[in-house]
Amino acid sequence: MNLPEYISKDEVKRICKELGLRDWSKLKEASVTEKEAAEILQIVNTKGMDIPVEDFKQGLEVELEHGTRYDDANVTNNHPILTGKIVLAHLKETMDYYKRLEVVEIEGDILKAVLAKDLKKVESKYKELVQAQQLLAKAIKEQLPE
């Protein structure tokens, strides 16, 4: 089955220009500036959720995987508003969504390294895992009542 391009690169270019952002259709790395994240957050956060810009920025960088990063999984063509809405939906589920995801992704990386018998990578990823778990534990603690 031949699927259409749902969001064109021209549309991504148009919206980026309108918002004063760099052209996200040309992004090679999933890297978003704090200024870009703040601009997009202001547009998509219509219900006024208390979302730290840094958390939203992390979400944007993760959710760009729904764009041009994987051509066979491209849904958004890196459209900044659609990507922002994906982030918003996940943060509505739980505000620590991306901290939890970071832990899971590192655990997956550790398994890959174990299967590849790459002990150096296992060690470095395990150190990353400890840091990610600490950040998640802190986020959970902050959500709990005193």
Where are these regions (language model features)?
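Short histidine
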Residues: 7, 28-32
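Long amphipathic alpha-helices with heptad-repeat character
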Residues: 122-137
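Intrinsically disordered, low-structural-confidence terminal and linker regions
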Residues: 1-20
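Short acidic DE-rich linear segments
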Residues: 143-146
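Flexible, glycine-rich loop/tail regions that form catalytic "lids" or insertion modules at the edges
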Residues: 21, 32-70, 81-83, 107, ...
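Amphipathic alpha-helical packing elements
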Residues: 74-109
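Short linear, low-complexity motifs centered on an aromatic residue
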Residues: 101-123
